[in-house]
A protein has these predicted regions:
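Membrane-water interface of alpha-helical transmembrane segments
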Residues: 2-9, 50-60, 86-89, 115-119
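Polytopic alpha-helical membrane-helix bundles and their juxtamembrane interface segments
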Residues: 3, 29-36, 77-79, 116-118, ...
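N-terminal signal-anchor transmembrane alpha helix
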Residues: 3-25
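Core segments of alpha-helical transmembrane spans in multipass integral membrane proteins
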Residues: 10, 22, 26, 34-79, ...
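Hydrophobic core of alpha-helical transmembrane segments in multi-pass integral membrane proteins
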Residues: 13, 71, 98-102, 126-135
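Residue-level micro-sites within transmembrane alpha helices that shape
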Residues: 18, 56, 65, 118-121
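Juxtamembrane helix-break-helix junctions at the cytosolic face
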Residues: 69-89, 107-111
Length: 139
């Protein structure tokens, strides 16, 4: 049993729940039909915005699946349901470290307003998962 991996998995279960519930509600507000009421779906502007919105939905789905699978892997490793695997552990740890650093850099480079940076502080969770998983790898 590895409590560090269990903790990383639990953090990701929480992140998944928050992502699905709050993220779905937040993202629905950006639906092009809400911004451009009364315009036909065939309208070029609506179609372009709809395509961009759907691409964002694809990314949202990818992140949802990634959070769920990563949580499952960390919990399975922590509970001893699957054997320790250094490559898997390193991959998961570096994935979250990379996401944390990259997302923080994007927010800084974009010079987003403070309220936006505060709302989008996902990098804190990503780095906490990476640090926790790194501690688990050391055992």
């Amino acid at each position: 049993m590895n409590a560090w991996f269990i903790a990383a998995g639990v953090m990701l279960v929480g992140a998944f729940g928050g992502h699905v519930v709050a993220g779905t509600r937040f993202y629905a507000k950006a639906r092009p039909e809400r911004e451009l009421p009364g315009r036909a779906p065939e309208d070029a502007v609506v179609a372009e915005r709809r395509a961009a919105w759907m691409l964002g939905r694809c990314g949202f789905l990818l992140i949802s699946v990634d959070l769920a699978l990563s949580a499952g892997c960390f919990l399975a490793l922590g509970l001893g349901l699957i054997p320790r695997n250094a490559v898997l552990e390193l991959f998961l740890t570096l994935t979250y470290a990379g996401w944390g650093v990259a997302w923080r850099a994007v927010l800084a480079a974009d010079r987003s307003p403070a309220a936006c940076r505060h709302r989008l502080r996902h990098w804190v969770v990503f780095l906490a998962v990476a640090l926790t998983a790194g501690c688990g790898m050391a055992l």
